[in-house]
Amino acid sequence: MKELEDRLYRSYLKAEAHQDYNAPDKEKRHPELTAPMIQKAAAHHRNILVTGSKGKGSVSHYIAFILEQFEKTGLFTSPHILQMRERIRVNHRMIEEETYDMLLEETTEYYLKLDQTLPENVGISPIGILCTMALRYFAMEQTTVNVLEYGKGVAYDDVNAVPREIGVIQPIFLEHQRELGRTIEEIAKNKAEIIQSGMKAVFAAKQIPEVMAILREKAHYEKVPLYEIDKDFRITYCEKEEETGKYTIRVAFADGKETGMVKVPMPGRWQADNFALAIGVTGYFLGEEKLISLLEEQSFQNRLSKLTIPGRLQCLREQPLVLMDACINGASAKYLAREYSEKKFLVVVVVPADKDYVGVCRAICPIANAIILSKTDNPHYHFSEKQALEVVKLDCVREAMIPVSYEGDLDSLFQLQVSTRSPMLLLGSTTMISAYAEWKGRRHE
């Protein structure tokens, strides 16, 4: 399989060697190369597309999980934890290895022939190839609706070639500025490209005013109805279970209809917002009464309680509390600091040197009694002991006298979370989540 998956990246890596690393997506990415095949594979499908800066994966899983109670539902998400085929699912079941290999071989054969006609600085995106494979698989499985998650952006993301019935926009903030834009307005305009004329609706999570203004303007221009949380549907009840950090919510629609109580399967207040957004989307798609009836079924609530999304504030231990989250920027870390403001954690940060590790450490200071920076062995990401030296300089670290250190052996920190008597928080990129899964697998061999 590795030899086949190397073909996914061949065109991309060829072009990357001849491109300016600091250039934005609009100068490097070429979604028009995969658009014809994606549009052909997506023909006759009902598709829901999801973008934003935080919570794309969670809300994609929630929407798909609800829809698959009635519809055969395809799900395309990124990134994966251990296997690439985790990104492609039908009714939450991962694509079979034999089918994945067949689609990978056929699809890369087509695109590598196309690559031979391209200049050396122009490449085909691995995401475009995977999206083509996913849509072909969904067609083979005769899905009746698909949920597809964008990558970093929208305007130059290959997924944007997928015809969509509904768009979903999670909170947008400053992130991936090198690729998407230097200002929040540039990033919002990039992601607002999810809104296209002919769509039935677009749903938006809570946004800062500058972002919401851009989304409203785009929706008005494209003549697409925009449904906003807290305006067109809203949480009317929200209570936290202190032991688990999970929330029970109730959601009301604009016409006065209201769901019963639903316990969100993942901890964190933002997951309550994510699930409320999923309720808004699926209420529109299925019909409010049909959704409300489903949410009241105890059998559905039992199934929902077993839904897990690795790396999304994953609870590794309850006593003491040990949490792991794919958090690589300060904005995401602020959510955690607010959510657990009454606790103190030993915080492990595994964020590459070219990402916002300083922002993560600054935001998490209020709930940290110690910070340890570490690294993964993934060759595509750069980590350095110098990161700890930068964190030591932070005012919040100095004022609170928070010990900061660097530990190059991540496995030793995974082992520590098994034996620690103090709350622990592991924050980092998905390569950390993957490293944990691999460590856990070795431990149980």
Residue ranges of model-derived segments:
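Short functional linear segments
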Residues: 1-52, 59-69, 76, 115-119
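ATP-dependent carboxylate-amine ligase catalytic core
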Residues: 36-43, 71-162, 178-180
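Short Gly/Thr/Asp-enriched flexible loops that form oxyanion-binding sites at enzyme active sites
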Residues: 63, 153-165, 437-440
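Beta-strand->loop->alpha-helix junctions that form or flank phosphate-binding loops
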Residues: 76-79, 204-206, 218-241, 264-269, ...
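Acidic, Mg2+-coordinating active-site environments of NTP-dependent enzymes
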Residues: 114-118, 141-142, 149, 164-261, ...
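Nucleotide phosphate-binding/pyrophosphate-handling subdomain across enzymes
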Residues: 145, 157-168, 172-176, 186, ...
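C-terminal helical cap/extension that packs against the catalytic core
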Residues: 208-227, 321-324, 361-423
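Alpha-helix capping/helix-boundary segments
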Residues: 431-432
